[in-house]
């Protein structure tokens, strides 16, 4: 797959993604980054809006959810167990290891899957290299210097992707 830092879809938040949008793109498997996409790095408690979105989406029969995280801590599996969600940790994004494992687990081709995350250099690049639809969302929190710096470095790719989308 091509090496691309440009997301296919940009959304403000994970909660902005609707079943209708995903169905229109023929997405049957939605892989979700965890940190700063579902919850901030500093807590494992989602906002009420995020909790409601996860619950609603997890009840859908035609779109499956799986958290695909680079985290190697117990917080992701614990979060998922409490909410009836599946997860893959140690995903090693941007390598396709965790993404391919998820596709195989669900028996879904890459063309019918998407990965949502807040980072271009891990989530978007990993999704694009694996051939799944990349969806970039705003980070929930830029609580330290390195997160702010990373987002500044990602800004040119975001602007190019937005400009490309406006021309379509």
Where are these regions (language model features)?
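Asp-based, Mg2+/Mn2+-dependent phosphohydrolase catalytic module
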Residues: 2-32, 39, 43-44, 48-115, ...
């Amino acid at each position: 797959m091509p090496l691309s830092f440009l997301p296919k879809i940009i959304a403000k938040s994970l909660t902005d993604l609707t079943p209708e949008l995903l169905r229109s793109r023929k997405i049957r498997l939605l892989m979700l980054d965890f940190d700063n996409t579902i919850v901030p790095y500093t807590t494992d408690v989602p906002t009420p809006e995020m909790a409601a979105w996860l619950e609603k989406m997890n009840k859908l029969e035609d779109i499956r959810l799986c958290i695909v995280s680079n985290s190697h801590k117990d917080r992701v599996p614990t979060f998922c167990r409490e909410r009836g969600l599946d997860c893959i940790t140690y995903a090693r994004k941007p390598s396709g290891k965790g993404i391919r494992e998820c596709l195989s687990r669900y028996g879904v081709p890459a063309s019918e899957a998407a990965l949502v995350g807040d980072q271009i250099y891990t989530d978007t690049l990993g999704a694009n290299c694996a051939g799944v639809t990349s969806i970039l969302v705003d980070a929930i929190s830029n609580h330290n210097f390195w997160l702010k710096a990373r987002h500044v470095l990602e800004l040119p790719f975001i602007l190019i992707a937005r400009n490309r989308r406006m021309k379509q």
